[in-house]
Amino acid sequence: MSRFFAGGGSDSDSESSSDSEVVARPAAPQFTFSDEEEDVKRVVRSTKEKRYEDLSNIIKNIRNYKKIKDMSSMLTSFEELTRAHTKALPVITKVENGVTPRFIIRALAELEDFINMVWEDKEGRKNLSKNNSKSLGTLRQKFRKYIKDFDSDLKKFRESPDAADDDEEEEEKKEESESEDEQHVAPAAAKAVSFKKEVKQVKVEKDDDESDDSIDWDMDSDSDESSSDEETQYTSIRERFLKKAEKDDGEDAENKKEKKKLQKDSKDRLKKKRAEDDDEGWEVVNGNRSTSAEQPKMFAKDAEIDVNVVINKLNEVMAARGKKRTDRKLQIEFLRELRTIADTHNLGDAVAAKIRFNIVSAIFDYNPKVSEPMKLEHWSKLLEEIQALIKLLLANDDIVLSETILEENEEYETAPYKIRGCILTAVERLDDEFTKLLKECDPHSNDYVDRLKDEVTVSSVIEQVVKYIERLGNDTETCRVYLRKIDHLYYKFDPNVLKKKKKELPASTLTSVDEMDRLCRFVYAKDQTDRLRTRAILSHIFHHALHDNWFQARDLVLMSHLQETIHHSDPPTQILYNRTMANLGLCAFRHGNVKDAHQCLVDLMMTGKPKELLAQGLVPQRQNERSLEQEKVEKQRQMPFHMHINLELLECVYLVSAMLLEIPYMAAHEFDARRRMISKTFYQQLRSSERQSLVGPPESMREHVVAAAKAMRHGNWNACSTFIVNKKMNVKVWDLFYEADRVREMLIKFIKEESLRTYLFTYSNVYASISVPYLAEMFELPKSKVHSLISKMIINEELMASLDDPTETVVLHRSEPSRLQALSMQLSDKVTNLVDSNERIFEMKQGNFFQRGGNQGYNRDRQNYRNQNQNQNWSGNRRQDNRENRGNRNQNRDRDHRKQHRVEFEEKAE
């Protein structure tokens, strides 16, 4: 408004001119016009500038959204960025020769770091809103898919992230040149420059030159003076818009040269000042720490370095351990510098061991959350420090590192050296960190394999600690370190054990079974706590079962009586017990002990949660069955993937064992109403298959077992073995066994035997006699084996028959009742049970109603009546008497007797 009305005094006028400016304006022209329309030229931008500007604006928005963690807006901006980059691809291909600009790669790298940081912060993710949480998952998924095309560019950027972006440098130079051109325009044109341009000009000059404010103020005052002079020098509008003289152009060129010279001089003065500041010893202060006094100071240049000075400085550094504002990374750096100083002045191995032990402790403290694993760079440094510390302790016999030594009793100058600390605790924590690192990795990725390679290093560290602890002679610590060694040994299969059994190796060869036996026997003898002994026994059983030492493993289980007291143990020990019983069941199955295998696995499989009981994963639960805290604790107990037991193999062994036991039992007790299920899980699978209206060919492992069970019920061993042993089942289950061919042969032999028993139970009522050679031919078994099976059935009274040796036949003496007869007997038994229960209910009601003295006489008379009725009517055959006693006549008579006795009882009571 001030540009158009001479007398106006608005805010814009005050901004464009100085506050102290007082100008007398002529009264003739009541308004003036701005030169902005004439002086500002239209700028034609190239396609590259347009596309790059769009990308820059989107990247700027993404950085703003990162500050406030607005995931929804960030997802929208990322989609806009992908579309803008697609539009800019022709320009990039033409101008940049297909190389993606560095500022785009920088933005993608920053976004990747931000997404990973937010995703790893599990507590922070829980606090996000539902919309932001959903947008984070979608953004992470889309970004990981989109970033694959920029892998090589990102890798190069990660190598040198601090390098400046080429496009940004060009833009800065361009802006600087534009700002110089704009600030040196003629006084009449300077008035038309917008406020936005002025701010940008000052900012560029501040960033580039960081000069004093006086230069800018001089420039502003010059421009204001020129504008005021311009407004006063014209008396009419016509003179104001006339073309300027040529001499003005010469004056403007001279003004430009002078101002450029002033700017160059200011830059030189600034560089000189910075150089002087660097010479004076200025240093950059970390903004995270409030004061520099919190940092422990190293020694002065002229200080005398000895053992006491170094130990005091070490105590000073470690005194800040655990405090709120302690920089853990800086603390580790100070300790390493202190170790370097101690090595330089040759202060001895004892001081070096003390410092290294404190470095190990500081690395452990670097990770504040105990439930989360440490970073990989800290893990590698931790391994190096512990290996160097143990090597130092083993090389010096006169250094004793123990937690029983008090701080005032430490000795660093004269042998024997005494240091307070516990190397065993450090190694135990190292082992726990290794387990957490494994559980954090994806088990199906190469990262897990890379981390698993560190187990060789961890095992060697434990071996070295075993040597050191054995040298100290402390039985308690020896048991603890032995158990750590057992934990890394018990689940590993050693083929030399089986070769030694087959006498392919000399008897003096030491195997893992011999090593386990030595370690566990020491723990059995010296341990003072039940937990270590229990875990040693379970690990010993597991290792024996893994190498098919069935009898040794079984005897250890029976002698230890762990199954009676294991429910009092801690959860990790109970998990180890479940793993041991599962492996023992597999061992029993490999040895052909089907019943023992079923007994070992039944408690584990009947719950329906073998995955959780073996700590191999969590099954999704219904609402409110497991809280977040419980789920977090249970996830910490999970076993690493390489220690898992194949659940499909375990379930198949259990179902096959149940089939070999349940099908003959069902055939033998088909019409028995009091039949009990041997395996509830197998019975449910069988019943669910029978309820299906249409059953197709088997596909899964369970369907194969159910189809085999149905074939066995009819005595068809060939179809049963085909369903159990085939190409698909071999790949899924049987090829996972050691010596799989032997297991398959044993399984087919058992199927033949149990199919024979099922056939005899099912069809014995059809035959009067059966030929033994015919049975041997039908089931492809030797005659001796058929003879043995039938003899056992006759001895156990499972089959009412006799063997005729001259004719080699089985003579059946009594046939089983028909189906109608069996159902009739079941009905009579159920009716009998119903009547007895009704009588008991009636007696309870009568006893509650009549609570006076005549109650005893009534019960006595009723009991006499029942005894008399039993003596008269329940003699002879039980089934025939049951049918007669349940007739209408007996029911009426019993009812009359009850009424008569009730009347007599009431008369007595009155």
From Swiss-Prot:
Cellular compartments annotated: Cytoplasm
Amino acid composition bias (Low complexity), ranges on this chain: 865-877
Chain's role: Component of the eukaryotic translation initiation factor 3 (eIF-3) complex, which is involved in protein synthesis of a specialized repertoire of mRNAs and, together with other initiation factors, stimulates binding of mRNA and methionyl-tRNAi to the 40S ribosome. The eIF-3 complex specifically targets and initiates translation of a subset of mRNAs involved in cell proliferation.
Single Gene Ontology MF annotation: translation initiation factor binding
Oxidoreductase is among the record's keywords: no
Entry keyword set: Cytoplasm, Initiation factor, Protein biosynthesis
Entry annotated with the keyword Cytoplasm: yes
Bias kind Gly residues: ranges: 1-10
Listed GO CC annotations: eukaryotic 43S preinitiation complex; eukaryotic 48S preinitiation complex; eukaryotic translation initiation factor 3 complex
Name assigned to this protein: Eukaryotic translation initiation factor 3 subunit C
Biased composition (Basic and acidic residues): 195-206, 237-268, 878-910
Subunit details: Component of the eukaryotic translation initiation factor 3 (eIF-3) complex.
InterPro entries listed in its UniProt record: EIF3C, EIF3C_N_dom, PCI_dom, WH_DNA-bd_sf
GO biological process: formation of cytoplasmic translation initiation complex
Organism for this UniProt entry: Aedes aegypti (Yellowfever mosquito)
Chain residue ranges for the region called Disordered: 1-31, 157-289, 852-910
HAMAP family reported for this sequence: eIF3c
Compositional bias of kind Acidic residues: 162-181, 207-232
Similarity section: Belongs to the eIF-3 subunit C family.
Residue span, PCI domain: 641-817
